């Protein structure tokens, strides 16, 4: 596919097979990463989408090394793998774990082969300048079948009779660098997705926003320590853990009418409700006894006497 002929060398056949496979894998890294990123952004909240875009602006040393990152991601994903979860973050994080493991090993192999070729490169050969090597942004726009041809033309324009071993070394260096930049993007995205599983998407979004604000603030106006996601989620966990559950059963409202509490007062030695309106005295009917006066304290004489 790549039309690479290095049969005069004793190790030409082996290098040709490894070189062809590594070029094919490294060229496929970019579209795989871009496709999955765009697909995931379509189903993402606007704030989370912005936070995910801001992940690319964070310093490189903020993220763990690839070996540590993959190990932490697998620990976070293991419970979801056992339950065959199909959550968005689980599927995307699983994709990036497989992608990073495969292409990271491939990239390390490319570096090892490039270093081993140094011994057979003529000592007087000048290295290909960086400007003649295809960059990551250019590789995204060049068709897959033309990537090798474009790089070969640049090497020839630098030096037409450039030694073939030095050419292979230049190709490996160029494609390994493209792979590393693609892996860096995949590493940041993997960190985002498996942390969303650990802490929740809303908490990770809030954390990224606070962290970028802290980083963009001048040193003399900001706190000494950067915000941590543990400190952000601790108040939420404390509030949830501090809730007390009542042991008794509570009657649901609406099943029985609520009884109205009526205040009462004592009027002339008997209880009388305030809610009841005082009735006006009814007119005296014929034949009814006269009402007893409250001012008279003596008894009326008995008619028997």
From Swiss-Prot:
InterPro entries: Hepatitis_core, Viral_capsid_core_dom_sf_HBV
Renumbered residue ranges of the record's region Disordered: 226-305
Description of how the protein assembles with itself and partners: Homodimerizes.
Cellular component terms (Gene Ontology): extracellular region
Species the sequence originates in: Duck hepatitis B virus (isolate Shanghai/DHBVQCA34) (DHBV)
Transmembrane segments: none
Biased composition annotated in UniProt, kind: Basic residues: 258-277, 295-305
Annotated Gene3D superfamilies: Viral capsid, core domain supefamily, Hepatitis B virus
Gene Ontology molecular function, alphabetical: structural molecule activity
Keywords on record: Host-virus interaction, Secreted, Signal, Viral immunoevasion
Propeptide feature ranges: 273-305
Annotated signal sequence range: 1-19
Similarity section: Belongs to the avihepadnavirus precore antigen family.
Chain positions of site Cleavage: 272-273
Keyword Cell membrane set for record: no
Location of the protein in the cell: Secreted
Protein name stated in the entry: External core antigen
Free-text function comment from the UniProt entry: May regulate immune response to the intracellular capsid in acting as a T-cell tolerogen, by having an immunoregulatory effect which prevents destruction of infected cells by cytotoxic T-cells.
Top-rank taxon, per record: Viruses
């Amino acid at each position: 596919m790549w039309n690479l002929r290095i049969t005069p060398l004793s190790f030409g056949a082996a290098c040709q097979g490894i070189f062809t496979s590594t070029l094919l894998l490294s060229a496929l890294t970019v579209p795989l990463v871009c496709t999955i990123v765009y697909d995931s952004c379509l189903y993402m909240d606007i704030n989370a989408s912005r936070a995910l875009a801001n992940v690319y602006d964070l310093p490189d040393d903020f993220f763990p090394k690839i070996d540590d990152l993959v190990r932490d991601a697998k620990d976070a994903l293991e419970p979801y793998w056992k339950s065959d979860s199909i959550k968005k973050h689980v599927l995307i994080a699983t994709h990036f774990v497989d992608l990073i493991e495969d292409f990271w090993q491939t990239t390390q192999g490319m570096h090892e082969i490039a270093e081993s070729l140094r011994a057979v490169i003529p000592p007087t050969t000048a290295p290909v300048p960086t400007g003649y090597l295809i960059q990551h942004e250019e590789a995204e726009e060049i068709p897959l079948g033309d990537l090798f041809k474009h790089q070969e033309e640049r090497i020839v324009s630098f030096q037409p009779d450039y030694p073939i071993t030095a050419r292979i070394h230049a190709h490996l260096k160029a494609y390994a660098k493209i792979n590393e930049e693609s892996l860096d993007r995949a590493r940041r995205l993997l960190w985002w997705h498996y942390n969303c599983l650990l802490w929740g998407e809303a908490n990770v979004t809030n954390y990224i926003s606070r962290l970028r604000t802290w980083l963009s603030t001048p040193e003399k106006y900001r706190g000494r320590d950067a915000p941590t996601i543990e400190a952000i989620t601790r108040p939420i966990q404390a509030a949830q853990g501090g809730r007390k559950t009542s042991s008794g059963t509570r009657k649901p409202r609406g099943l029985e009418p609520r009884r109205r509490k009526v205040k009462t007062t004592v009027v002339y030695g008997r209880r009388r409700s305030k809610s009841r309106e005082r009735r006006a005295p009814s007119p005296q009917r014929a034949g009814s006894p006269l009402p007893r006066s409250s001012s008279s304290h003596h008894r009326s004489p008995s008619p028997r006497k």
